[in-house]
Structure formats: C-alpha cells, structure tokens
Amino acid sequence: MAADGKNVLIMAGGTGGHVFPALACAREFQARGYSVHWLGTPRGIENELVPQAGLPLHLIQVSGLRGKGKLSLLKAPFTLIKAVLQARRIIRQLKPVCVLGFGGYVTGPGGVAARLCGVPLVIHEQNARAGTANRLLVPLSARVCEAFPNTFEASDKRRTTGNPVRPELFMDAQRAPLAERRARLLVLGGSLGAEPLNKLLPKALSEVPAGLRPEVFHQAGKQHAPITAERYHEAGVAAQVEPFIKDMAQAYGWADMVVCRAGALTVSELAAAGLPSMLVPLPHAIDDHQTHNAQYLAREGAAFLMPQATTGAAQLAERLNEVLMQPEKLNVMAGTARRLAKPAATSTVVDICLEVAHG
C-alpha cells in the first residue's frame, strides 16, 4: 500500500467499455506516483483484466436489476445495503484520496460508500446518454466527467473530457493516396462479433462494382468467423475474416473507413484514429445509447448513421459506392473525425480527480 495520501480507488466493472478507459486512467495515476486499487464485482470482465494489469482488485456483491423477477426486486434493497457496507469497509481500509467511478453495477454502492466516508467522488460517463448509476450519483459527486458534450445537465460540476483511449491510436498513419490504390474497409462487430453485420457486409459488397470494391478486413467473432468467410466466398467478394483483432491500432492504421457498431469507446477510437465510419448502432442497447453515441460523429459529418432496421444490403452498397467514388469525401470525413478527438482525455480526468482530492 502506498504512503498516506497516495491511494486512489477506481470503480469499473462488467464490460470492456467501462474497464478499458478506467485502466488508461489507472496507468496515468501510477505514472504520477499513486497506488491504484480497483473495486469490482465477481462476474465482470474486470476479474480478468485488472489482475493482468497488476492492480489489486476488491470485490463487492451486487448485480443489475433490469429484467429480474419479483423475488430479486424484493431482495434488492437488502442487497444494495450489503454492497454499500462492503464498499465502505474497503474505502475505510484504503483511505483513498479520491474515488473515480466509470459505471457498471459496482459504481452505485461504491459511490454511496465514498460519500459516507467523506472521500471525494468523481464519475466518468463514457456514453452520450448516461447510465442509471451515474445519473443517480450526480448529486453525491464532486465532479461529473462526460465523454460527449451535454450528456449531463449544465452545472459547475460538469466537465467534458472525452473518453480515455489508448495513446497509440492518435498516431498519424502513413497511407498512400487513395487515387493510387484500392480503398480499405475495416468491419468491426466487437470482440464477440455482430451477426447482423456479418450477414450484411458480404451482400452489400457484392453489389459494389468489382473495380470499385475495397479491400476488406472483417472481425466476425470467434463463433461466426467461419460462416462469415463462407458468405464472402459465396458472394464472390475477397475478404480477410478474423475472429478477433489483437492489434486494433494497427487495424485502424491500415483502414480508410470502418463499418461497425457505436459503442462509446469505438466512437472515441474512430475519432482518435481519424477514420470515417458507417455506424450501425446496436438496436437493443440500454436507453438506445449507441444511437446517441453515433450522432456525435454523424452530426459533424465524420460518420454516417445507419439504423439497423432500415439498412439493408442495397442501402449500405449505395452509401459505399457514394464514398468510394469520391475519395476526397473520405478525406474530409477523416479530418472531421480527428478534430473531434480528445487526446488529453486521460490526463484531464486524472487532473480533475487530483484537483478535488488536494484542492
């Protein structure tokens, strides 16, 4: 444990969308001489990623309430009280100078416990529409960080910081001019794949004239990669299909444009990499937050928002033809995306935490 006044507690759990930006901030805290501890839950991805990062992980018992049965709802108040008490015990033991929450089920009880212990609480919202826990914690927070403008109501607590993303994504890729080569299309569905995109892209690309058709690199997910490769073969479209892309910075550096979902980190990474995109938001995302994320890039002209319900192969092919026949349009979109990036997001969030911690 670090010396008094040098501990920080980060709360993030459940999915990579919460955990990865929190890990970026953890590394920044460590670079400034702070000892970082992590508060999570037993079932989230943090149980794999946080120990890999060499950070101590503290667990509390809490889970979501959406879609649960009546018995779970009746037990909920007692479960939450127990989780708050568990978090309070951990905070009292660690004596952190501040608590930084990134969302997930752990953030609610942890945020309440921070307030009960008199430790400054800072929350960070990755999506353009705030999650339930972060919305409820605003009154208890010393500062409220948002990745996208106007996610929270205007107040002296609010700071628009952007999403912490990997610094290597901000490197300028050296690409030959599009006039001298075929365009390159990167298709992403998340680490598990997005089956609607896996079905849509081969059909859409088969409707693009062969002379205009881009090179294709498609992340299809472990379970769907073989059938996706077969779909491309049957459609007569050459494509490299992989279950998972380990080096996203390299993939972004290769691509000229991207077709993908609109998770908060993906949208922020597209801006960091300066990549035009066609965004197909996950239609059943909680509070439709992916559509709101996509609108951030689409409103400024850095992306096309293409709702899944109204986007078939013909519609996607038409959009692809439009940009492939106008390489200068891709260049303009790329520049717009890069201007929307927030390269200082990680250091800004950490600055805010230390400001409230030390005055």
From Swiss-Prot:
Swiss-Prot/TrEMBL keywords: Cell cycle, Cell division, Cell inner membrane, Cell membrane, Cell shape, Cell wall biogenesis/degradation, Glycosyltransferase, Membrane, Peptidoglycan synthesis, Transferase
Membrane topology annotation: Peripheral membrane protein
GO molecular function: UDP-N-acetyl-D-glucosamine:N-acetylmuramoyl-L-alanyl-D-glutamyl-meso-2,6-diaminopimelyl-D-alanyl-D-alanine-diphosphoundecaprenol 4-beta-N-acetylglucosaminlytransferase activity; undecaprenyldiphospho-muramoylpentapeptide beta-N-acetylglucosaminyltransferase activity
Pfam hit, one: Glyco_transf_28
Pathway it works in: Cell wall biogenesis; peptidoglycan biosynthesis
Gene3D superfamilies: Glycogen Phosphorylase B
EC nos: 2.4.1.227
Record's keyword annotation contains Cell cycle: yes
Major subcellular location class: membrane
Family of the protein in this entry: Belongs to the glycosyltransferase 28 family. MurG subfamily.
The protein's name in its UniProt record: UDP-N-acetylglucosamine--N-acetylmuramyl-(pentapeptide) pyrophosphoryl-undecaprenol N-acetylglucosamine transferase
Species this protein is from: Pseudomonas putida (strain GB-1)
Classification of source organism: Bacteria, Pseudomonadati, Pseudomonadota, Gammaproteobacteria, Pseudomonadales
